[in-house]
Amino acid sequence: MSFGGMFDGAGSGVFSYDAGGGGGGGGVHNSRLLPTPPVPKPGGGFAAPGLSLGLQTMDGSQLGDVNRSLAMMGNGGSGSGGDGDSLGRGREEENDSRSGSDNLDGASGDELDPDNSNPRKKKKRYHRHTPQQIQELEAVFKECPHPDEKQRMELSRRLNLESRQVKFWFQNRRTQMKQTQIERHENALLRQENDKLRAENMTIREAMRNPMCASCGGAAVLGEVSLEEQHLRIENARLKDELDRVCALAGKFLGRPISSISSPGPPSLQACSGLELGVGSNGGFGLGALGASAAMQSIPDLMGGSSGLTGGPVGSAAMRLPAGIGGLDGAMHAAAADGGAIDRAVLLELALAAMDELVKVAQMDEPLWLPSLDGGFETLNYDEYHRAFARVVGQCPAGYVSEATRESGIAIISSVDLVDSLMDAPRWSEMFPCVVARASTTDIISSGMGGTRSGSIQLMHAELQVLSPLVPIREVVFLRFCKQHAEGLWAVVDVSVDAVLRPDQNGGGGSSSSSYMGCRLLPTGCIVQDMNNGYSKVTWVVHAEYDETAAHQLYRPLLRSGQALGARRWLASLQRQCQYLAILCSNSLPARDHAAITPVGRRSMLKLAQRMTDNFCAGVCASAAQKWRRLDEWRGEGGGGGGGGGGDGEDKVRMMARHSVGAPGEPPGVVLSATTSVRLPGTLPQRVFDYLRDEQRRGDWDILANGEAMQEMDHIAKGQHHGNAVSLLRPNATSGNQNNMLILQETCTDSSGSLVVYAPVDVQSMHVVMNGGDSAYVSLLPSGFAILPDGHNNGASPSPAEVGSGASPNSAAGGGGGSNNTGSLVTVAFQILVNNLPTAKLTVESVDTVSNLLSCTIQKIKSALQASIISP
């Protein structure tokens, strides 16, 4: 960096060589400028040494002239004696104190005597210390920069030097170190001053673009340009050229052009090395050396103000940085949730380390990932993992267990569209409605570079759910980092920041309520690579630690298997949602769809079904998205039976209530939610799903069917699987109330689980929706079923819940089509309006009625499937 000749020729000093040997051996050092010894002045003061960066190398004669000139500047020294004595002593001390570089060689006694009658007639000869002498002196200096007289005598004897030479060598060596520190400090101050000048120039430039009159507020007419403004323009042009050169160097380092308009990083980070990214030889990609310094250089606007993403504001002002120019002290910290300060460099280092780990874990096979013998899930070899990677989120809290899964597949979505959905919290929730209960962006560390999402880092808060009241919600606060590694190749990684935000807490999550489960995300995310025809190959990795004791024992095998919130569920949900979006955007109708519905009506009906499913999931998991008031757990009658029921023969039902007042899309009054989960050992999830979505067998269990089959009026496909659809059902009952009622039903299924959600709607409202009307004001209360595998493998031993509840390890599952330990976990949830008055009080009779209805429905399903039931 040029400083415009600020230091050229400034100051004075003694120029010496910190080197040894004329042969250029290992002991040769670059020449340095040493400050002159203090020069006496008449007033007894001393001149401060100067600083010069521009002196050229001088030969011995020139050094002698300089020494003589310096000595002649004195005026008698500190003792008595004249100019001659002072000159002699100055020359002698300087000759003896040459930093191990110049030494007297073979000089006679007369030559060394300062009182010689003609000392200037004979030219003194000098030589350098040998490399061995310098090496020995340097070694001692590292151990003891201030040796005492005894140590100096020992060194002089061992190195064949005079004690005075050793003494002066150490003095000069200490002076060199001090001078280096001073230079570094001055350079740092100059860099800060340079940044301030840049900021001032930017302010002046903005003011010159739109000059305003201070008195009238109108446009000001520029007069004659002053001399000061001309200097500012010249300085501004010079700074711009310098910035362009820096951007060009950064572009060469990163392999992509860097705009000079981007705000520069803070001065302390300008010297950091860049992040090395490249395409790997195996078709994947790899990362070079990573660290916080790499992040600063590779993301130019990383330390700028907290600009928001397109499409929505940033959620919490508490985590927002003050907007401003990068490099200000305030831009280096974000406020923590508890009011503390977080160094952004720590967050950047965490994000980069997580990205490095995700890329490697997604690429590596054996011995890191061990294939299962039955062709199922891969297993992470934790011994190999701990050898290969350092922990990025601290030690695992006591009582937590780990889950690690990996899955790959093809999705009908481009890499850019998927990345945009993941980096936008509302779109992310819509993409995974059954997994993400709620999500928000707390802070934007970086909005990306070059107008893309590459380099974007966000601090996010999310609630992850398993559709059952027996599994608390996982609340996580994490960093999401997106990076483009090559053309059409992206990676998005999540990593918990609990250890940074709350270092005094061992557990993850931000709530101590029993409705939440402690959880920490280790590097988790996906690798997306574009393929032909709008498809992408997606590799999903989930690595988490959670408090298993918070979940009921019925669901612990499912959680341990990684099927509850593992990579397979994320990828399967993504594939199903992408198929739905592709059909929604298509102009052609699937073969199974009814042609009577217009395209606008189809979209309106699908939007209504999506709202119904979202409300169902929020009611099952008691997410904070809906304000439910939890009641005491009820015991329904007749939930068990068949030899496989719970220990007391009753179902444990979670009851919640809320008052709906003027909410669009909901009937006013008191809404009661009843939810329970049971296990059907030996009954496959697909069999349960096919039975529940069959309108011909609806009368077996649905009280709305009045014991009869239903007729499908309309059908809208949502995917390639015939089980992914939205249907409009009509009861075959003859009563007036039934004739005015229809059933809106949405069914979803994939390899991770299935969902059947339905709600009664009136005929007039559905006619409006099917003709393209707004569905936001259609009132409905959803009910339905969430079906998941139970997580038991063939031949596995029964869980403690089975043994404790009276289940027999050898009991057969009638009609289950599988072994005893392969079954389903079914969650049943009803939302019922128990009173039309929002101010009415909830009665015990209403709660008992809904609880008994839930238990009766489970009993009917059990009888129809000829299955045994294990209740919590």
Curated annotation (Swiss-Prot):
InterPro entries: GLABRA2/ANL2/PDF2/ATML1-like, HD, Homeobox_CS, Homeodomain-like_sf, START-like_dom_sf, START_lipid-bd_dom. Residues 28-53, 67-130, 792-818 are annotated as: Disordered. Residues 74-85 have a biased composition (Gly residues). Its main location: nucleus. Residues 340-583 form the START domain. GO terms for molecular function: DNA binding; DNA-binding transcription factor activity, RNA polymerase II-specific; lipid binding. Keywords: Coiled coil, DNA-binding, Homeobox, Nucleus, Transcription, Transcription regulation. It is found in: Nucleus. The keyword Plastid does not apply. Residues 176-248 form a coiled coil. CDD domains: homeodomain, START_ArGLABRA2_like. Residues 122-181 bind DNA. One of its GO terms (cellular component) is nucleus. The keyword Metal-binding does not apply. Pfam families: Homeodomain, START. Residues 86-99 have a biased composition (Basic and acidic residues). Residues 119-130 have a biased composition (Basic residues). SUPFAM superfamilies: Bet v1-like, Homeodomain-like. Probable transcription factor. Belongs to the HD-ZIP homeobox family. Class IV subfamily. This is Homeobox-leucine zipper protein ROC6. It comes from Oryza sativa subsp. japonica. The gene is ROC6.
